[in-house]
Amino acid sequence: MSKHIAGPEIERLIQLLARIPGLGPRSARRAALHLIKKKETLLEPLGAAIQAAVQKVCICSVCGNVDTIDPCSICTDPRRDDATIIVVEDIADLWALERAKTLAARYHVLGGKLSPLDGIGPDELNIAPLIQRVVQNPITEIILAVNATVEGQTTAHYITDQLSNFSVKVTRLAHGVPVGGELDYLDDGTLAAALQARTNL
């Protein structure tokens, strides 16, 4: 009995889908079958969209975001606050902040976080280009929107130290109780951060 249940093209589709984060082999098979069943309405448009992305998507040379133009749509948006840069670890973090629609600032994607154990030092991240942006532009505030992990906080402290000689305000996202969160369900570290970052009413 053959170990393959379909032709090599379908097997290849399943293998590639299984490499997407959150999709294992079983989910990939289901997704592939769904795409094949909806060939004209889903598989073909998806293939065309992927092909267009391969040809047009690029990394913004200013902030590190992905877009189909360089500089990206955010960097060229005249409605943005040029004096404020939000620093994020990854493009996914940038997109998350954009969904919040709270602050129309500029961004800077580091491309990761400092992690000596993994061999990731300052030279492996986009820290030098961030400093260069501060040197070349009238930046008044850097918002460090890094994750509340040991590596994220180490990265934040390193960047703060690198910016200490510039007349720029460095802030970070508040840590603590999430909206709708109940104290009884929060971990000790989150509660401690919330107490330290308490505000007046």
Swiss-Prot record:
Keywords assigned by UniProt, alphabetized: DNA damage, DNA recombination, DNA repair, Metal-binding, Zinc, Zinc-finger
GO function term, MF aspect, one: DNA binding
NCBIfam families xrefs: recR
GO biological process, one term: DNA recombination
Disulfide bridge positions per record: none
UniProt key word Translocase: no
Name by which UniProt lists this protein: Recombination protein RecR
The encoding gene: recR
